[in-house]
């Protein structure tokens, strides 16, 4: 980085890719994507001040800043997750109920796999109740995968814009 200028972001750009731009990333943990204000350095050392618009959803790869020299994207770090793999909807429903009582967000990884961030007190209880159907694995918990009782908020925001 050539200067100590703070990059202040209060709206997200319309991406117009250029050929010779440097790629940079603002690294976030899964639980930071809903924060309204984020101040930290990017991987390349740029000081970023993100004042997130309330309607914006910070998902993996989202461009949050672009100029003629660089593009800054969101990078959500993978984390240790408790994963239930089951095609039995009753088991999936019970698991979601057990996890929902802890107010942890649930993520749909694929058709038969759901994940939540690791919780050291909850994992043994889930393993005891669901056996080998529950395991630990590393996943990127992206807001586009979150399950809500009224549908996926990310997908609803996309439909409203179209």
Predicted features and spans:
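Short, flexible, solvent-exposed loop/turn segments with mixed acidic/basic and small polar residues
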Residues: 37-40, 70-76, 102-107
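Conserved, well-structured core segments that form or line functional sites
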Residues: 88-130
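Intrinsically disordered, low-complexity, positively charged segments
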Residues: 1-50, 148
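Short, well-ordered loop/turn sites that connect or cap secondary structure elements
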Residues: 52, 56-58, 64
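Short glycine-/aliphatic-rich beta-strand segments at the starts of folded cytosolic domains
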Residues: 74-86
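A short, compositionally biased
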Residues: 32-36, 58-59, 101-102
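Helix-rich terminal scaffold detector
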Residues: 1-20, 115-162
């Amino acid at each position: 980085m050539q200067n100590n200028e703070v990059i202040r972001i209060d709206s997200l750009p319309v991406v117009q890719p250029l050929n010779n731009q440097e790629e940079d990333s603002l690294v976030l943990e899964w639980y930071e994507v809903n924060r309204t204000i984020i101040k930290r350095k990017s991987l390349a050392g740029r000081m970023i001040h993100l004042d997130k618009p309330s309607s914006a959803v910070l998902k993996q790869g989202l461009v949050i800043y672009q100029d003629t020299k660089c593009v800054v994207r969101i990078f959500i770090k993978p984390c240790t997750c408790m994963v239930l793999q089951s095609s039995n909807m009753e088991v999936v429903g019970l698991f979601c109920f057990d996890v929902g009582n802890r107010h942890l967000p649930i993520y749909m990884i694929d058709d038969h796999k759901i994940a939540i961030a690791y919780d050291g007190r909850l994992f043994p209880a889930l393993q005891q109740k669901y056996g080998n159907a529950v395991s630990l694995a590393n996943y990127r918990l992206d807001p586009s995968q979150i399950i809500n009782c009224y549908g996926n908020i990310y997908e609803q925001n996309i439909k409203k814009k179209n």
